[in-house]
Design a protein with these regions (language model features):
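Terminal alpha-helical segments
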Residues: 1-144
């Protein structure tokens, strides 16, 4: 992971910061709450549920970054894409690796829904809720 992470740092996509375990745990708690909320509204508001499950996964990845002493560079566009690249590097080889690698597809789905004309259906929510949960679980496990 370090060589590819160094490339993200070198390209100005990710930067080193002081690790902050307290902030990381708070962010992971937010992710869990988003997952719970997504489940509650999935049948009546699939698009809203998808935004919540995507944000849950993203915030969990952000929590991993904070715990590890990194963050996405704030001064550049494409922060969520950099988050996806980090997820694939940092979480992509463990038992939840497939879900971490699918985060970028989830990002693109969410963008198409937010900025395009694509409607998210319940089956997409159900499928990606599995991956969002796995990402949150992977980050939780990494905290020890």
């Amino acid at each position: 992971m370090s060589l590819d992470l160094e490339a993200l740092i070198g390209k100005g996509r990710v930067e080193r910061v002081e690790a902050d375990a307290s902030a990381a745990r708070d962010r992971l708690d937010e992710a869990r709450h988003h997952l719970d909320s997504a489940v509650l509204i999935a049948k009546t508001d699939p698009a809203g549920a998808y935004s919540l499950l995507y944000d849950a996964a993203r915030k969990a990845i952000d929590a991993h970054m904070l715990m590890s002493g990194y963050r996405v560079t704030k001064s550049r566009l494409g922060g969520h894409e950099a988050t996806a690249r980090y997820a694939a590097l940092a979480l992509g080889s463990g038992s939840h690796g497939e879900s971490a690698r699918r985060f970028d597809r989830m990002r693109r789905n969410r963008n198409r829904s937010e900025y395009g004309a694509w409607q998210i259906g319940r089956s997409t929510v159900e499928a990606d809720l599995v991956h969002a949960r796995a990402i949150v679980e992977a980050v939780d496990e990494s905290f020890g």
